[in-house]
Swiss-Prot record:
Keyword Cytoplasm listed: yes
GO molecular function: spermidine synthase activity
Domain PABS: 5-238
Enzyme class at the top of the EC tree: transferase
Entry function: Catalyzes the irreversible transfer of a propylamine group from the amino donor S-adenosylmethioninamine (decarboxy-AdoMet) to putrescine (1,4-diaminobutane) to yield spermidine.
Official protein name in the record: Polyamine aminopropyltransferase
Organism expressing this protein natively: Buchnera aphidicola subsp. Schizaphis graminum (strain Sg)
Catalytic activity: S-adenosyl 3-(methylsulfanyl)propylamine + putrescine = S-methyl-5'-thioadenosine + spermidine + H(+)
Length: 286
């Protein structure tokens, strides 16, 4: 919702956040999304889809580093990656930093998102769209995983919230077909919203993931532009040993890559899986 120079998020009914608008850079509704991109003096450029903040220049690095590097470093031998969604290019940018990865497939329902983010958020992708390892498929994510014969070591679901086009990417059917697209010991991760305000959605994701993977959990990060508390990331795999790696071995994997980060490190990685008791209690009841 826009009120003069103020934009109000409309994800939650009784609470929310607002941003002042310095300048509207783009605003249009297409058959998939209602998109606005505007400038804010604190957060830089902000993109909202269907009334919900998707990304900002200021804090995008937290989300993209955590959703990408946690599964890659836990696994240790990722070669083939599928990104479902992710048209802003941030996940792609982080994946492309790993030179050992051989193939990257991105499935994005709306080509317009990719084009807009290339124009208005160039630092998100940092020229990663030119990487020769990348293949872009314009399709619905659920439809793609239902039909593809390809196999992946890692699937990252960088979706919108479970409303509109994004709803399909939280269904048990989606997780089932993602599982079928993974090689043995493959990993699925995805964004799952803010637990404090989206508890029911996260509980349902937990149930759906448990139907398809032996090791299911969530890990977390605090991202200022995602209102209401810590952002939850879902984790699913059949290999129960990945999360048993000790911190020294994890640190060695990270050091060997010779990468630098703005948020992610080995301590953040390990501690992100230690959830507050109220979340544990709620998941146990589900």
């Amino acid at each position: 919702m826009i009120n003069e120079k103020i934009w109000h998020e409309k994800l939650h009914r009784h609470v929310g956040q607002y941003f002042s608008i310095d300048k509207i850079l783009y605003q249009k509704k297409n058959k998939y999304h209602d998109i606005i991109i505007f400038q804010n003096s604190i957060m830089g450029r902000i993109m909202a889809i269907d009334g919900v903040v998707q990304t900002t220049e200021k804090d995008e690095f937290i989300y993209h580093e955590m959703l990408t590097h946690v599964p890659i470093f836990y696994h240790g031998l990722i070669k083939n990656v599928l990104i479902v969604g992710g048209g802003d290019g941030g996940i792609l940018r982080e994946i492309c930093r790993h030179k050992s990865i051989e193939n990257i497939t991105m499935v994005e329902i709306d080509l317009n998102i990719i084009d807009l983010c290339k124009q208005f958020f160039p630092k998100h992708n940092n020229n990663a769209y030119k990487d020769p390892r990348l293949k872009i498929v314009i399709d619905n994510g659920l439809n793609f995983v239902q039909k593809t014969k390809e196999k992946f070591d890692l699937i990252i679901s960088d979706s919108t919230d479970p409303i509109g086009c994004g709803k399909d990417l939280f269904l048990s059917d989606f997780y089932f077909h993602c599982k079928n697209c993974l090689v043995k010991n493959g990993i699925f991760v995805g964004q799952n919203g803010v637990f404090f305000l989206q508890k029911n959605d996260i509980n349902q994701s937990y149930k759906n993931l448990k139907k398809n993977f032996h090791d299911v959990s969530f890990y977390q990060a605090t991202i200022p532009s995602y209102y209401g508390g810590t952002m939850m990331f879902s984790w699913g795999t059949d290999n129960i040993d990945f999360r048993q790696i000790n911190i020294k071995n994890l640190e060695k994997r990270i050091k060997d890559k010779k990468l630098t980060f703005n948020y992610y490190n080995s301590n953040i990685h390990i501690s992100s899986f230690y959830l507050p008791q109220y979340i544990i209690n709620t998941l146990d009841k589900s």
